[in-house]
A protein has these predicted regions:
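N-terminal small/polar loop signature for handling phosphorylated ligands or for N-terminal nucleophile
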Residues: 1-39
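Short Gly/Thr/Asp-enriched flexible loops that form oxyanion-binding sites at enzyme active sites
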Residues: 35-54, 80-82
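Phosphate-binding and adjacent anionic-ligand microenvironments
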Residues: 64-214
Length: 214
């Protein structure tokens, strides 16, 4: 038993087993109301939804150049460095995590699509009507597979290697969380100002639209 949640590792493991047992090309997992979609590749490996969003954005950009995409701040930084999106003059805006925040920003910016790491994907015209739709998300994945004529494992392996963890939500009292974030922002700003390297990299940008990202 598991929670019908595209971020739930037990659910993804069950879909992975089904993909391998049936020699399937792809596996999809939807939440209870069908507005989120998780993806398992042909080898039974789970793909975090932000990277699926990146692959969909790349595929859409070939037909919809000069488009905007909205992603939440938990999403991969590959959106900012992707050569396909750059070649098609597409812009990515990192925004607040949360269904309502991303949906509103997609419509405000008249973006083609919005992607949240939780699996909420939003599509504007001509792809959708601005709301999150798990079935539409799965269809867009099928489109990119068809257009590239490759296995999903091949497509995902062509992306630069990055390291991610599942979404974590450690407890923090509501009265304390804003102070914790403020203290963390100050610390990160000090590290940036001192040009202290983390994993041999200097901090280039600090994004505080929702917590802190660097």
């Amino acid at each position: 038993k598991y929670n019908p949640n595209p971020e739930d590792m037990k659910m993804l493991k069950a879909i992975s087993d089904a993909v391998k047992n049936n020699n399937a090309d792809i596996g999809f997992g939807f939440d209870g109301d069908g507005d989120r979609c998780g993806v398992i590749d042909n080898e039974g490996k789970e793909i975090f939804s932000d990277k699926i969003g990146l692959l969909i954005a790349r595929n859409l950009s070939t037909k919809h150049a000069n488009s905007k995409f909205i992603v939440d701040v938990k999403s991969t930084g590959l959106f900012n460095t992707d050569n396909v999106l750059a070649e098609n003059n597409c812009k990515t805006i990192y925004w607040k995590t949360g269904h309502s925040h991303i949906k509103r920003k997609v419509n405000l910016e008249k973006a083609l699509a919005g992607f949240e790491k939780s699996g909420h994907f939003f599509f504007n015209q001509p792809l959708g009507y601005g709301y999150d739709d798990g079935i539409n998300s799965a269809i867009q994945v099928c489109h990119l597979l068809n257009n590239q004529n490759k296995k999903m494992s091949e497509i995902i392996n062509e992306l630069p290697k990055t390291f991610q963890s599942p979404t974590m939500a450690p407890y923090c009292d509501d009265k304390e969380k804003y102070r914790v974030v403020e203290d963390l922002v100050k610390k990160i700003e000090e590290i940036k100002a001192q040009k202290t390297k983390i994993d041999n990299q200097e901090i280039k940008e600090i994004l505080t639209v929702n917590g802190v990202r660097f």
